[in-house]
Amino acid sequence: MAKQGRARVLTEQEHQKMLTFLAQTAYPERNLALYLIGYRTGMRVASIAGLQLSDVFDQSGKLKEVVNLSKSIVKGGKNYAVYLTHEEVREAIYNYVSIRPNRASKSALFLNNRGEPFSANSLSQLFLKLFRRAGFEGASSHSNRRSFATRAIQKGVDIVAVKTLMNHSNISTTAIYCEHNEEFLKKAVSSI
């Protein structure tokens, strides 16, 4: 359970429920791509909102595996890399872009219902609305980021690697994101 004030961490079952829910929304391709890029990469909502088509696609139209985010869209003002290597994310982005209007390379990757780029705030509000409609009280745009960090640690990814993937300056910040349930802690003790 999330501590007071912390965004809810989604379980694998909740993730599957969210995928099913998003597939039935008014903008399923866009909403799935938005959700999955956050859930599978741990990107902050402001960075997702700031993505341009040219950030994620090369000149030949191929989706990049490594996206180097510029400091202009990154908290802390330092460049960092995001890895778009998860097949689920890649498929969702391709599906969205195939139906997305305005494919000029200098335009925002994600557009709202009016065909305009999302602001960080409007994208946060969309995530909040989608999570609530899916029945996940306490979930917000930050739930994807916390879920990513928690899942990575629980699957055995070294916390230093998670720190790098999350673009944290301090490892203690990364530790705050990770939520450990009793089953995980039992397995941890048993493995020592």
What is each stretch, according to the model?
Residues 47-49, 139, 149, 157-167:
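Active-site-proximal segment of tyrosine recombinases
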Residues 50-57, 163-169, 178-179:
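A short, basic/aromatic helix-end/turn motif that makes direct DNA contacts
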Residues 12-41, 45:
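Basic, Lys/Arg- and aromatic-enriched nucleic-acid-binding interface segment
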Residues 74-94, 106-128:
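C-terminal catalytic core of Y-nucleophile DNA break-rejoin enzymes
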Residues 50-79, 83, 88:
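Conserved tyrosine-mediated DNA breakage-rejoining catalytic core shared by Y-recombinases
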Residues 1-16, 76-86, 103-105:
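DNA breakage-rejoining catalytic core of tyrosine-based enzymes
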Residues 69-75, 171-191:
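Catalytic-site neighborhood detector that most strongly recognizes the C-terminal catalytic loop/helix
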Residues 31, 137-155:
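Short basic/aromatic active-site micro-motif
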